[in-house]
């Protein structure tokens, strides 16, 4: 009974780390963005700053659950009687905390904060994943926007 549960927990944690966060960059588009009309404006980069983009804490739940199951299983293999129960509980708590920390580290990606002076004189700030294209101050850029989403690309 416990072995299938552990296998499912490990698979869930592993697959959660495979989530595609490439749509955060200006070089990758989601399927829903394809063939959609976007407004295009142009501008010049005023500043470029490297940042880290952290995924939401709700994404760490699978890591915590997987870690707790694995930690509880390992704790259950220690001792007997009351000692085994305490080891199981301690293993589940420690495993949950470790799993959440590992999942949190996997949810981080390198990004870039771009301050852009648009040709109309307004200044905006955009954070997006750092793609293969490197940005530099003074560079002309294209801004493709749809709703509140803006993607910055080199011109």
Swiss-Prot record:
Coiled coil (UniProt feature): none
Keyword Membrane on entry: yes
Broad class of the protein's primary localization: membrane
Membrane topology: Lipid-anchor
Annotated keywords: Cell outer membrane, Lipoprotein, Membrane, Palmitate, Signal
Lipid linkage positions (S-diacylglycerol cysteine): 18
Domain of life per record: Bacteria
Database matches in PANTHER family: OUTER MEMBRANE LIPOPROTEIN SLYB, PTHR35603
Family, as annotated: Belongs to the Pcp/SlyB lipoprotein family.
Role, per record: Facilitates ferrioxamine uptake.
The protein's name in its UniProt record: Outer membrane lipoprotein pcp
Organism: Yersinia enterocolitica
Lineage: Bacteria, Pseudomonadati, Pseudomonadota, Gammaproteobacteria, Enterobacterales
Annotated gene: pcp
């Amino acid at each position: 009974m416990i072995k299938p549960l552990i296998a499912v927990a490990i698979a869930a944690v592993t697959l959660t780390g495979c989530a595609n966060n490439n749509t955060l960059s200006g070089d990758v588009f989601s399927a829903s963005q394809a063939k959609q009309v976007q407004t295009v404006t142009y501008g010049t980069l005023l500043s470029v700053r490297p940042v880290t983009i952290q995924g939401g804490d709700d994404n760490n739940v699978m890591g915590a659950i997987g870690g707790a199951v694995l930690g509880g299983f390992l704790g259950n293999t220690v001792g007997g009687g009351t000692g085994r129960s305490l080891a199981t509980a301690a293993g589940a708590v420690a495993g949950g905390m470790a799993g959440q920390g590992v999942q949190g580290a996997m949810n981080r990606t390198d990004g870039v904060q771009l301050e852009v002076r648009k040709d109309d004189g307004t200044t905006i700030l955009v954070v997006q994943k750092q793609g293969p294209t490197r940005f530099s101050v003074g560079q002309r850029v294209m801004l493709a926007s749809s709703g509140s989403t803006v993607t910055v690309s080199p011109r």
